[in-house]
Amino acid sequence: MAERRGPALVLGLLLAMCGCKPGWPHFDAPDGTFSAELPPPLRVEAERIEGSQRLLSVESHGNEDQAFLVQRRRPVPGRRLDPTGVLDGFCAEFARARSYEITTDARGRRRDGRAAQTCAFRAQGLEIRIQVVAAGQCVYTLMAMWRGPAPDVDRFFDGFRVLEDCPVDQNPSP
């Protein structure tokens, strides 16, 4: 019996040292527009209207020192959104509104080719990384916040997928 434990122990140590991580819960948007992977526990707020836009939020508060958020914004029916305009100046406006120090502000494209703005901020020991992604008439905000050791933010950003661009909704609600 001891002979069998040796290889199992070696395999276990090898897996632990190679960084195998448990999977995060997978969230699929009810309308099929996006999917995301966030650490548990997840809290989902149903889509709601705020002014001229509709918001859907998914968040994770693994512990009091870190949080992850995915928020989808799209216009109410009959309105249009300029996604590129939303990306322009996002980092500066976000920092100015909250008195945060900008540590990163970069425009580029995600692996899927979608336009994105990436920002990082610091304020009173709080670290924040945000990626804003344009997808048709939707704009997604991916936010990671933490104090102390950094969580796996790249895993969070890479686990987000736009599955379908949001189309223009021409029919205003009655």
Residue spans of the language-model regions?
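N-terminal secretory signal peptides that target proteins for export/translocation
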Residues: M1-R4
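Post-signal peptide N-terminal segment of mature Sec-exported envelope proteins
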Residues: F27-E50
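Bacterial N-terminal signal peptides
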Residues: A8-C18
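Bacterial signal peptide processing site
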Residues: G19-G23
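Beta-strand-rich interaction surfaces with strong enrichment in secreted/lumenal proteins
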Residues: H26, D105-G108
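A short, amphipathic edge element
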Residues: A95-T104
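Short, well-structured beta-strand
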Residues: S52-D82, L87-C91, R110-P174
